[in-house]
């Protein structure tokens, strides 16, 4: 029966079965599955009978209310069937039951169609995987009827309650299953017991979106939810109740099916519909070429009018949520002398040149069009592309005076000046010589730091390169090697889309110059494949003037591919390679439309059984030859040609007028008679129009001997007859005697055609023997080589035409040697391209198939296998090619010398090979060579057996070791290898014009992406599946070196890992759990689990990694590989033995070629908002330093004492969030009705408090802490985290209150659970106020301190949160914090304490309370002791009149030194040079272990590190950083989403931010730069700011260098994120729990979270869009499937969402209105009104509005001057109204007012505003007003000034939501 793979493809003309590769692959998979999936399983040995049996029954359909099971099978109702629990049963509709039924398309069986092949016939596929094609000869209506599919299920126990209610129920399926398979309720079905091996799926594709899944999660999902279960198309998978996936496609041996069994050997493929796409469009010179054969548009129109719209449409059809980045890139060439007055950019020091200095000067350009834009905004993307195309060529062709290196410099430097007017000084290079590798390398930087600042809603990064070329690129060898190393170490996929027609050679093809020194020492990256294809350039005598002018797009060899051949006077070596990490496609809108139209038409019947005839299409030639174009195609300018007999002395040529030479060369290939339809399946380098069937190729193409040879015309007629006439069968030629074979003239026929594969494209097909000048040969040769039916021991030989001088000597055989069998091939070579018409010349060449090796001058025998591996079939070269990887460069001999150019003979030397002897097992062994090389080793025999047929032209890539030669030299001498082995195994060396005949193994050509392809893809079609939903790197692979290669070519590092019994509970307790975690960690870092026969051969305890019981066995061996690193994990007793294999580095090469670890690359990049191109210096090098796997495994096992900084050393996954204070939603205030009297600041603090309670509730407590908790105390509420709330910035707090911070107990939030024994615990019913007051103020009581809040200093007070905790821990009958608050209010009612401002009752939070006078114990350390007792209960002003100001620097220094003196003896800093005076260390953040899986849905502990601020100013951002090593990101995302809902209720916006600062974004993302904004007018002199401490009345003065810049940012609703590291005192060691502060500039974030801003040292602004700010918005995630359309968004209501500015706000923040005494003419600089729905809908719009409004304000000199004056005036007014400062008011001025708390930001509004808007109760409002009146208003801070001006404050405007 014909396989579906044999008829796939839009251009298939004939009717062919599956290709040989497909059949071989399917047979391998089937055999592997049969061997692995036994029909008699150990757990159920009797469940699968030997022969299937059927049983008819009635099918029911149920819903979820009836049962949640998909299938119910009542075994008692089927007593005669013999079913048991565990059987695999197939459900199919009974014959005739579905006839005539009208089913919906989704209800019937799927008419499966391969994407990209629109003309593929669609067949209903059943569970067995084979199409129902036996009815082709029957009724057409029957063939077109849709039939229900077949469903598989495993019998489970029948629920007893269902049996009791429905005893007659036989089989029932769920509604969704019935709809998917077309089952009807009460219909008759057949039940068939199936063997698991018969129904096992080979591949299963699953899709997911809006999730970040690690590959370890995919592995766990597969083992938990898929293995040993039947699956079906459309099935929903739910893992851990959170991770969701859908089964997209199911394959059995490459065929799609609806249902199958997921065996342990099934390969899962995970595809993401929410990925990050980076589209590179190569703007080479061909992009502006016109399409001469199509519409006449330029090639760029194909991109903008057809390709991109089609891509966006397909994304919209699948509802994808991708982020798109588009970059235009090109390389501009400057190849002419530039005058000295030209731009400095044309200086040689600024441009790139070739390594030899002879190449033209070039400069690479990158223009970012869009960056991280949602795919739904395709109209914006296309508009941006069109606009950029208009100016791109102008911008890159006219160089600027010089390239700026910073964004600010780009704004200052004019593009053109009078001295340097614009001048076109360059032109784009061709696509061949473009900078494609550099672009790929730069784009891969997206994954270099993927563990830092992780986006938790997207998975995968795909690079798409659109090029106008044909897929051939000339690249530097070193960059190709470095890029291959980088890409193989990162899980990133690359798609290459070519706009030009596909050439007739292998693509994608990288052409590179080999290093001059081609030998290296052992340890080089020795490939497990054959040597790369290398050929030598001809000398200048063979110039391109003698070649056919193949200078148009679409030719067999493009002009770019032929440029420079023969141009160098000295010989240069070239290599060709096909990378495994590139997926190539070809886009032609005409073919796409034609294929779409053909897919809609009805297919016609074919005379051939089991095939389908395609609609006829016009013949479109792929090759355009100048000779054919110049003559009429229908003209008859042919002449007879005769081929002379071969001469034993020289190659005789005969000149004949033949204009058909080119025609013969273009169509002179015929399929092999023994190819069985495989040769006609088409390949990537031969057009489908050339495919044909031949009934008898011996009669029609290959005459048996010279007597039957006819003239060329008759031969062509026979050829035409063979093309246009179909024959059902081919005949093999008869075998003739050896004598006759030796006597007659043999012709060689072309190789067989194979279906190409994706990543190797056309390289998997058969060689193209039409030598269309691949190496500058001055003739075109047509050869037909007859394939002999010899034994496998006799490999085919490669021939080269002998020269005139050495032909006789070579042909003379040695005595006592067997007579060689020779063959002759015909060659038609064009003699010149002059005015006379070209003539066809016939020549012969000798093929020696059995000859003894002759000694060569280089000590080399032609038998050398390396020589055989590297020689080519083309006659263009006059010397043997260089050897393979194990061959040093031989000396040139007489035969190596180039032939005389005047002779122009097409002959070449005969390559004579040594006789191979046959081993006992039938393998071919090379004869030992004496004194040839100083290397040793043997070639694996299986390579010769597998690929002997293909070594005639160029051997295929081997799967074993590289070829080593025997040597009689020093056995200890290291082997030498080829330089191009550095590219292996990630770039396959290939002869592009004569690729191997036999397809190598899939693992050899697909590399790491082998298991992504269920079936062999096509090169000609666009890989839409990869472009729509890119696949994650497969979990498994099959590439593994042999045991001998691991020993010789790899460095081994063994170590053992054992479980720490004393470790915390979150680490695994068993060896199996530890092994799972070790495998998961490696999968998360890009490793793949190696499976297949190679692993079985090297491990005795190998078991399938998808088997749930496999990892628990002793001796289990797991191989994992990533690039050049292989890990072997072996379970040995109770330990795990890890052996790390690292490929030896390259040695022996020139330093400038390979030994350098990186290359400095300086492209010119222009980002979206950049004014000009800026130079970037990028290091194109290998991946970062090697991961410390020993420490990582020890960390997983619980050994963590030796790790000092696990976050950075072990590369934890890290993400950072901030809580931004925004306006409290009106709807949320109803939920906190008890806090109506609170101001907004207090509500924000309450929200943080609620979050900390949640963190404490889900906090992981280690066993050592858990054991100290009694059972009675475990039920009590967790204590909130100890966060110090301040109204100053952290740097000010550290400088002013260093003593207090050092005395703070860092473990208060981890206080002991019990302070008193159970016998001493208090009870509420027997306590007195006096006794309780003594306990509270005692040694173990509540902490009493003097605390400052804004402008007031409160003495001897305690915090409500701490008092609640104390009550909870010291009272036996108080178990919850609510009970403690209730008891505290009772105490407050009885007069034990009161609020410091008498505004609030007792609350659990950051509220200050004081003990009543009658119960107070005077503390000598308190400031309250300095005053009379009657004044102690009141808060005093912050600025006493009797104290003068002190110098800030001296005061800070004195305070710091005092702190050091007092604490130096207590601190022990290792390595300190001054142990007596060490730096005090202060941590501004703490961490705890948080359990993200409180419901225990995962099979492992899910614990992360949660870092939070220890010191927090309510006006600033509250920082949260998460880090984890082996947790599930989806559970982390779920925890974050629960925080979002809690924070929103209290006016806090949880926003994800980048971990690095905005100014350093270019270091990690080359295509992003901050946008600079400069002030049009310099601000006036900076005023002096002051601050006060809680322990001193002295007002400390500090200069605020960026006072006005901070005021501008606050004006535009920015809040402080992080301060610069220079803001902290230099004599204090400040750090966070995640590291030390490293920000160079202070950073602010907009309240929407959309924009980051920094202030540089020069006072400029740097703005950067935050691409994460909307990723965790519940609205965006809920409605993300609507592509952010504003009309479809209805987010939850927020305050001020729909409030216009002219309406009074019902919330705290009033609308900004001009006040008397201010200039109302100054317009507000607040950004335009932006609602919450707009912010969640379009981040670009929000970002642009903020940027534009801020830029407009900073560019308006009048507004700036008015703003500066207003700020100075307002600050002066607030300073002069201050009571204590009035004595020194004579010193005040508008620019230098009195020193006050300018550095203390505040959120609190004036009391009058607060009282009016909050509607406080009358007594409370009066008390607040009185307290405010008693307090002097010392306002010199930015907040105080902003509140007194008419400019919109952070509380005014629509942003406060």
Curated annotation (Swiss-Prot):
<feature type="compositionally biased region" description="Polar residues">
    <location>
        <begin position="639"/>
        <end position="652"/>
    </location>
</feature>
<dbReference type="GO" id="GO:0005096">
    <property type="term" value="F:GTPase activator activity"/>
</dbReference>
<dbReference type="InterPro" id="IPR000591">
    <property type="entry name" value="DEP_dom"/>
</dbReference>
<dbReference type="Pfam" id="PF24438">
    <property type="entry name" value="IML1_N_fung"/>
</dbReference>
<dbReference type="GO" id="GO:0010508">
    <property type="term" value="P:positive regulation of autophagy"/>
</dbReference>
<feature type="region of interest" description="Disordered">
    <location>
        <begin position="1"/>
        <end position="55"/>
    </location>
</feature>
<feature type="domain" description="DEP">
    <location>
        <begin position="1338"/>
        <end position="1413"/>
    </location>
</feature>
<dbReference type="Pfam" id="PF00610">
    <property type="entry name" value="DEP"/>
</dbReference>
<dbReference type="InterPro" id="IPR027244">
    <property type="entry name" value="IML1"/>
</dbReference>
<feature type="region of interest" description="Disordered">
    <location>
        <begin position="724"/>
        <end position="777"/>
    </location>
</feature>
<keyword id="KW-0472">Membrane</keyword>
<dbReference type="InterPro" id="IPR045838">
    <property type="entry name" value="DEPDC5_CTD"/>
</dbReference>
<dbReference type="GO" id="GO:0035556">
    <property type="term" value="P:intracellular signal transduction"/>
</dbReference>
<feature type="compositionally biased region" description="Polar residues">
    <location>
        <begin position="667"/>
        <end position="679"/>
    </location>
</feature>
<dbReference type="InterPro" id="IPR048255">
    <property type="entry name" value="IML1_N"/>
</dbReference>
<feature type="compositionally biased region" description="Low complexity">
    <location>
        <begin position="1719"/>
        <end position="1730"/>
    </location>
</feature>
<feature type="compositionally biased region" description="Basic and acidic residues">
    <location>
        <begin position="741"/>
        <end position="757"/>
    </location>
</feature>
<dbReference type="InterPro" id="IPR036388">
    <property type="entry name" value="WH-like_DNA-bd_sf"/>
</dbReference>
<dbReference type="GO" id="GO:1904262">
    <property type="term" value="P:negative regulation of TORC1 signaling"/>
</dbReference>
<feature type="region of interest" description="Disordered">
    <location>
        <begin position="833"/>
        <end position="943"/>
    </location>
</feature>
<dbReference type="InterPro" id="IPR036390">
    <property type="entry name" value="WH_DNA-bd_sf"/>
</dbReference>
<feature type="compositionally biased region" description="Low complexity">
    <location>
        <begin position="1469"/>
        <end position="1483"/>
    </location>
</feature>
<feature type="compositionally biased region" description="Basic and acidic residues">
    <location>
        <begin position="1454"/>
        <end position="1465"/>
    </location>
</feature>
<dbReference type="Pfam" id="PF19418">
    <property type="entry name" value="DEPDC5_CTD"/>
</dbReference>
<feature type="region of interest" description="Disordered">
    <location>
        <begin position="799"/>
        <end position="818"/>
    </location>
</feature>
<feature type="region of interest" description="Disordered">
    <location>
        <begin position="1711"/>
        <end position="1730"/>
    </location>
</feature>
<dbReference type="GO" id="GO:1990130">
    <property type="term" value="C:GATOR1 complex"/>
</dbReference>
<feature type="compositionally biased region" description="Basic residues">
    <location>
        <begin position="726"/>
        <end position="739"/>
    </location>
</feature>
<feature type="compositionally biased region" description="Polar residues">
    <location>
        <begin position="45"/>
        <end position="55"/>
    </location>
</feature>
<dbReference type="Pfam" id="PF12257">
    <property type="entry name" value="IML1"/>
</dbReference>
<keyword id="KW-0926">Vacuole</keyword>
<feature type="compositionally biased region" description="Polar residues">
    <location>
        <begin position="868"/>
        <end position="885"/>
    </location>
</feature>
<feature type="region of interest" description="Disordered">
    <location>
        <begin position="639"/>
        <end position="690"/>
    </location>
</feature>
<dbReference type="GO" id="GO:0005774">
    <property type="term" value="C:vacuolar membrane"/>
</dbReference>
<protein>
    <recommendedName>
        <fullName>Vacuolar membrane-associated protein IML1</fullName>
    </recommendedName>
</protein>
<comment type="similarity">
    <text>Belongs to the IML1 family.</text>
</comment>
<feature type="region of interest" description="Disordered">
    <location>
        <begin position="1426"/>
        <end position="1496"/>
    </location>
</feature>
